[in-house]
C-alpha cells in the first residue's frame, strides 16, 4: 500500500531536530514489569497488522513510499525497559521519559516504539512513539483502545493462525511499480480536474486562498520561542483539571468546550508574553488547531484524516470573560466561513506534487543525514532588539483530542494520567495538547 501525499509529507519534512512522531506518556498505577508488558503486546499484535509493516522508499523517489511487511519483525526491538534510580521524583521521571522521545524513529523497521520507565514508587511511565505518517491524533486514540482495556482483567483476544509474511519488493520492482502508477495517473488526468465543479467549490477555493494570504497580510507576533529554529531538546509539563469545571464554564458563559479550552490556553500564553514582550497591544497570536475530518467509515483506519484552522487571537492579557468572547467570535467566523473544509480542499489540490522533488529527503535518518549536524549545532535564539521580522507562520499548536471518558487499564494496571507530546519543528518551539 502506497502512502498518501499527506502521510508521505510527514516523512519528507522530518529532520533530526524535528522528528515527526506522535507520542503519549501513560502514567499507570503500580510497577508494570517488562515481562508482563511484553506478553500483553504479544497477545494483541495480530489486531494491529499495520504495526508489522515498514517503509520501503522508491528509488529516486519516483513515487511516494510503500508500506511493506517486515519479514524480520521482532517485537523485542519495539518494546524497551528503563529502570530509574531509587528516590527519583515524578518530574525527574517525566524529564527522563521526554528525553527518550527526542530521537527520530529508526526507518529500517516499523515506525513505532513503546518504552516503560520504572523506579518511581507506585507508578510506571509508558511512552508510546508512533510516526505521524502512520497515524493522526484521532486514529492514535482509537488504536490506544486496542492495547488498553476498560477492565483490569479482560479475556485475552484469541489470535488467528499465523500467516506467511510476504517478502518485501526489491528496488527494481518498487521502481517499476512507481513508473506504472505515474503513467496511470497521468492517463487519468482530465483538463477539468483542476477546475471547481460548482459554485460551492469555487467559494471554498477562494476562502482557502484568503486563509493562507492572511499569513502574510496579518503577521502574528514573534514569541520568544519563535525566534530561532528548534533544536533537538524537549521539555514537557502537564496540568490536570476536572472536565466538569470546563463544562461549568461553558454552561455559564456559552460557547463550546473547545472555545473554553482555547480561552484558557490563549490567555495563559498572553500572560506569558506579557512577561517577555514590551508591547502587546493590537498584536495577535496565530494558533494552529488541527481538525479531525475522519468520517465514520474511516474510523479505525490508519493514516491522516486531518485539516486545520488558524484562529488569530489577542496577544495581550484580558479578563477571562472578554477572552472567551474574543475566542467565540473568532471561532464562529472560522466556522461560518468553513475554513477547515477550505484548507482540506486546498491540501487535496496540492497532493499531486511530484515526489521526485523530495528525493533528497531519503538520506534523513541515515549516516549521510545533514540534519544531524544541524541538530548538533543549533542556531542561537535571536535576541530581542526591539524589532522582530514579521512572523508569517504560526506561534504554536493547540490540539484538543477527545480522550476516553472511562478508566483504562494496561496489563491490569490502571491508567492515572495521559500526557500528549506534540511535534515541534521549524521555528515553532511550543505546543499544547488537551486530552
Where are these regions (language model features)?
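Soluble acyl-CoA-dependent acyltransferase catalytic core bearing the H(X)4D motif
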Residues: 1-5, 14, 23-428, 435
Amino acid at each position: 500500500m502506497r502512502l498518501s501525499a499527506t502521510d508521505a509529507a510527514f516523512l519528507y519534512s522530518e529532520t533530526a531536530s524535528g522528528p515527526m512522531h506522535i507520542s503519549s506518556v501513560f502514567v499507570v498505577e503500580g510497577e508494570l514489569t517488562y515481562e508482563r508488558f511484553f506478553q500483553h503486546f504479544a497477545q494483541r499484535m495480530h489486531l494491529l497488522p499495520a504495526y508489522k509493516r515498514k517503509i520501503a522508499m522508491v528509488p529516486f523517489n519516483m513515487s511516494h513510499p510503500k508500506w511493506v511487511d517486515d519479514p524480520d519483525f521482532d517485537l523485542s526491538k519495539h518494546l524497551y525497559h528503563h529502570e530509574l534510580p531509587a528516590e527519583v521524583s515524578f518530574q525527574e521521571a517525566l524529564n527522563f521519559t521526554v528525553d527518550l522521545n527526542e530521537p527520530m524513529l529508526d526507518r529500517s523497521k516499523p515506525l513505532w516504539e513503546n518504552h516503560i520507565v520504572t523506579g518511581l514508587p507506585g507508578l510506571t511511565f509508558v511512552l508510546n512513539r508512533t510516526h505521524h505518517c502512520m497515524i493522526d491524533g484521532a486514529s492514535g486514540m482509537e488504536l490506544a483502545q486496542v492495547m488498553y482495556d476498560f477492565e483490569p482483567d479482560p479475556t485475552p483476544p484469541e489470535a488467528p493462525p499465523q500467516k506467511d509474511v510476504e517478502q518485501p519488493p526489491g528496488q527494481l520492482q518498487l521502481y517499476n511499480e512507481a513508473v506504472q502508477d505515474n503513467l496511470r495517473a497521468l492517463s487519468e488526468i482530465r483538463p477539468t480536474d483542476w477546475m471547481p465543479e460548482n459554485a460551492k467549490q469555487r467559494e471554498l477555493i477562494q476562502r482557502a486562498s484568503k486563509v493562507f494570504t492572511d499569513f502574510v497580510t496579518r503577521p502574528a507576533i514573534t514569541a520568544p520561542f519563535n525566534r530561532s529554529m528548534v533544536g533537538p531538546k524537549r521539555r514537557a509539563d502537564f496540568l490536570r483539571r476536572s472536565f466538569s469545571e470546563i463544562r461549568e464554564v461553558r454552561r455559564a458563559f456559552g460557547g463550546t468546550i473547545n472555545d473554553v479550552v482555547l480561552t484558557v490556553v490563549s490567555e495563559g500564553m498572553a500572560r506569558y508574553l506579557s512577561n517577555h514582550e514590551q508591547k502587546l497591544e493590537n498584536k495577535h497570536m496565530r494558533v494552529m488547531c488541527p481538525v479531525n475530518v475522519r468520517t465514520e467509515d474511516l474510523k479505525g483506519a490508519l493514516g491522516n484524516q486531518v485539516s486545520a484552522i488558524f484562529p488569530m487571537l489577542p496577544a495581550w492579557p484580558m479578563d477571562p470573560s472578554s477572552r472567551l468572547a474574543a475566542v467565540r467570535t473568532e471561532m464562529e467566523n472560522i466556522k461560518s466561513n468553513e475554513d477547515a473544509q477550505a484548507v482540506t480542499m486546498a491540501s487535496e489540490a496540492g497532493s499531486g506534487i511530484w515526489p521526485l522533488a523530495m528525493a533528497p529527503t531519503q538520506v534523513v535518518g541515515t549516516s549521510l543525514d545533514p540534519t544531524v549536524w544541524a541538530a548538533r549545532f543549533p542556531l542561537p535564539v535571536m535576541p530581542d532588539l526591539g524589532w522582530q521580522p514579521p512572523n508569517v507562520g504560526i506561534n504554536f499548536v493547540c490540539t484538543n483530542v477527545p480522550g476516553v471518558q472511562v478508566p483504562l487499564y494496561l496489563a491490569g494496571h490502571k491508567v492515572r494520567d495521559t500526557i500528549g507530546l506534540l511535534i515541534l519543528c521549524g521555528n515553532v518551539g511550543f505546543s499544547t495538547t488537551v486530552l
